């Protein structure tokens, strides 16, 4: 073993040398060797030990360390989550080696969604980069830091397609588009797992939440999902499959019901599709407490029935409840659950432990004890350079009237807003083991950028919200939002006074991190009224007004778009967020981000997404007609469309040229455009290619993203960007649930966003 110097392992191996000799060694990490090893190990296990492997518990008040020690001794734990230090992880693994009969190692997991100790932009921000190299950076750094903490698995990436910004977990995914989410998720899986999850600085991923969790009705957390098979497989399933095809070792099962059946009890989903059709060999993990929730769903009569239904459906590991350990022994004894079913689930768990290399070295992600950091949160453990680079790419310039931006590093700048100096909020939700006092706020970033060159005036200006009900909700478990006791008017007056003295006002506004999180669905997606009042007062000063948005979902910004001279969408930018945002504000970095999700004008437009189907009476603003698909009290399209984002320079895109007007089924057509930087600054933009199946056996979207390329051009420079199109890009699930491409005309759209495109067409023969 690699780190045999661990005292716990040495003692345990000395006590039972024969068993240890068989269990641990230099096992080949091949499917054949794994299957033989696990088959042999299963023969040595008791029923209780097999059940114990299916139990995933959280360290916390419900499971103090003393209680966990006894569970480990009795072989009643398979994995642990929510502990993130080498010291704690080593102690529990030592207990396995010293106290348990078979010494089957634990694996340790955590929600490493957009960073571990270094916090990167939230996934919605990362998607805004449209840069797979940025995704790889986040994945590799996150895996390195997680593995360096002793972790073996992350509950990520989240690849739920979301087209409803009311849903709080929209922040955790990659947006509204199937293709973008698929390729981002696939890239993240490969980056985090590296060549093998057994590698010292790699971790196993768990694609989540299977399936269609992002389509919950009304954007309400944990709600039901009901949709056709065609929509499910065309729009929502591809990202999961892409992540699994990339090699993800685990799947987290969604909390929602799908077409009337909770995913946790859906054997069609977990066996017929996941195992049989897709060939998945890893583990399925329930979401937190999901098995007991089957009773409230109404698909299980009691706890025992819930366990029976879940295991038979294909849920291998039970997260954060005691139901499997409590009720499976009786179900096995009665024959309601067979030994073969139990063995299948246990085999899946042991398989991933083998793939993690834990049977070669249970301490593979820990290293020798003497290498443990004296300070877990040491500054030296952070990757600030990478965090800043990725955060800059996540910023989207939404508006820039009269070239308000970039700002000068001179004069007087008023920095206001409740989020301007919040170290906690800039990290966003699911910020893993990130420490708030290590993050850079927007105020600090601006101060760092200007040094002594400009005078900075700061005023909070408003609370996040003055709605007591919302504040109480956000502070239910801790004081996440601190409320200034001053009157709203006094705070606004202070900010206005600062603005009047300044040459320009930078207002940092939006949501707190807790407003864009699990269980944080909103019916109103405007900026809270307290901040809207502040913006209105700042506008009245007549000073140039720059809005820096900090949020985890699209916001309805019609009024703010009218008031502001410039708007930056920065999402929750992470540990280096303030420095990265300042880089963009002052022109040290030219923004290149693009929106991965459409911004509605109002909540009444939802869902608004670019890849919708046409109706028989589509709205055409150039030909007004009362009887068309539109709202009569609101403009028809989004405020900002998918793929939208400005730059400090300008670009032109030529007409589309095609290599051929026709395409054979086994051939390709290449679509090309010439892109020119027509401005005065070097800049990057994302050239996006969309396809439309004009006439098919069922209605097809008006356009679908099928390719993109991020390019950087100097002033006056041009580049030809080409996209090869093959048969796979044209396929869809038809009415007969056959995945195929149909002959006929296809339109090709290429441009800088989903609305501003040039068009060509070809025919599939």
Task: Give the predicted meaning of each segment.
Residues 3, 755-758:
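Short glycine/proline-enriched turn or capping motifs at secondary-structure junctions
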Residues 1-19:
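Gram-negative bacterial Sec-dependent N-terminal signal peptides
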Residues 20-734, 740-754, 763-765:
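Glycoside hydrolase catalytic-domain context in secreted enzymes
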């Amino acid at each position: 073993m690699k780190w045999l110097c661990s005292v716990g392992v040495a003692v345990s191996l000395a006590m039972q040398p024969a068993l240890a000799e068989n269990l641990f060694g230099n096992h080949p990490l091949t499917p054949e060797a794994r299957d033989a090893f696990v088959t042999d190990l299963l023969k040595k296990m008791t029923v209780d030990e097999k059940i114990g492997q299916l139990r995933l518990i959280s360290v916390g008040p419900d499971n103090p360390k003393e209680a966990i020690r006894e569970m480990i001794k009795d072989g009643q734990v398979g994995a642990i989550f929510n502990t993130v230090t080498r010291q704690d992880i080593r102690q529990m693994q030592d207990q396995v080696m010293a106290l348990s009969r078979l010494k089957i190692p634990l694996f340790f997991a955590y929600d490493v969604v957009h960073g571990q100790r270094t916090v990167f932009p939230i996934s919605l921000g990362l998607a805004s980069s449209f840069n797979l190299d940025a995704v790889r950076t986040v994945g590799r750094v996150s895996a390195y830091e997680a593995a360096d903490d002793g972790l073996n698995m992350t509950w990520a990436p989240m690849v739920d397609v979301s087209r409803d910004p009311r849903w709080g977990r929209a922040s955790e995914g990659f947006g509204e588009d199937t293709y973008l989410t698929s390729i981002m998720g696939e890239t993240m899986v490969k980056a985090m797992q590296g060549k093998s999850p057994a590698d010292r600085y790699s971790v196993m991923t768990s694609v989540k939440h299977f399936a269609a969790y992002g389509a919950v009705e009304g954007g309400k957390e944990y709600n039901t999902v009901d949709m056709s098979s065609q929509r499910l497989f065309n729009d929502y399933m591809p990202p999961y499959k892409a992540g699994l095809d990339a090699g993800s070792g685990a799947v987290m099962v969604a909390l929602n019901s799908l077409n009337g059946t909770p995913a946790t009890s859906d054997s069609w989903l977990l066996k017929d599709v996941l195992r049989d059709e897709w060939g998945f060999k890893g583990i399925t993990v329930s979401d937190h407490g999901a098995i007991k929730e089957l009773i409230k769903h109404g698909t299980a009569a009691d706890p025992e029935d819930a366990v029976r239904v879940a295991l038979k459906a294909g849920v291998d590991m039970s997260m954060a409840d005691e139901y499997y350990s409590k009720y499976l022994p009786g179900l096995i004894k009665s024959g309601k659950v067979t030994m073969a079913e139990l063995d299948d689930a246990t085999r899946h768990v042991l398989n991933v432990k083998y793939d993690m290399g834990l049977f070669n070295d249970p301490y593979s992600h820990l290293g020798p004890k003497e290498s443990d950091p004296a300070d877990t949160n040491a500054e030296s453990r952070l990757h600030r350079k990478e965090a800043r680079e990725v955060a800059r790419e996540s910023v989207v310039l939404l508006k820039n009237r009269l070239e308000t931006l970039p700002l000068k590093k001179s004069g007087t700048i008023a920095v206001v807003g409740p989020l301007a100096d919040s170290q906690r909020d800039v990290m966003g939700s699911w910020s893993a083991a990130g420490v708030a006092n290590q993050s850079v706020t927007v105020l600090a970033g601006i101060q760092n950028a200007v040094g002594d060159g400009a005078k900075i005036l700061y005023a909070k200006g408003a609370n996040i919200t003055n709605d007591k009900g919302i504040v109480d909700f956000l502070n239910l478990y801790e004081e996440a939002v601190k409320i200034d006791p001053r009157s709203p008017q006094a705070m606004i007056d202070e900010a206005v006074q600062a603005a009047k003295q300044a040459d320009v006002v930078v207002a940092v506004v939006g949501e707190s991190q807790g407003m864009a999180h699990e269980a944080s669905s909103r019916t109103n997606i405007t900026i809270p009224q307290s901040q809207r009042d502040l913006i209105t007062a700042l506008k009245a000063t007549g000073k140039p007004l720059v809005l820096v948005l900090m949020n985890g979902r699209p916001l309805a910004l019609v009024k703010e778009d009218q008031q502001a001279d410039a708007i930056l969408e920065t999402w929750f930018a992470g540990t280096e967020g303030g420095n990265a945002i300042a880089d963009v504000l002052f022109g040290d970095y030219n923004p290149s981000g693009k929106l991965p999700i459409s911004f509605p004008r109002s909540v009444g437009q939802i869902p608004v997404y670019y890849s919708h189907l046409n109706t028989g009476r589509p709205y055409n603003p150039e030909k007004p007609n009362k009887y068309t698909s539109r709202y009569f009290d609101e403009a028809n399209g989004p405020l900002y469309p998918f793929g939208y984002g400005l730059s400090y320079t300008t670009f032109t895109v030529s007409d589309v040229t095609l290599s051929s007007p026709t395409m054979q089924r086994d051939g390709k057509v290449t679509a090309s455009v010439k892109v020119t930087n027509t401005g005065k600054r070097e800049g990057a933009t994302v050239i996006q290619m969309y396809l439309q199946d004009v006439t098919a056996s069922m209605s097809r979207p008006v356009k679908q993203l099928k390719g993109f390329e991020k390019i950087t051009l100097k002033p006056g420079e041009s580049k030809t960007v080409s996209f090869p199109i093959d048969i796979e890009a044209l396929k869809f699930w038809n009415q007969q649930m056959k995945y195929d491409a149909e002959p006929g005309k296809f339109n090709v759209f290429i441009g800088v966003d989903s609305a501003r495109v040039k068009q060509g067409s070809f025919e599939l023969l």
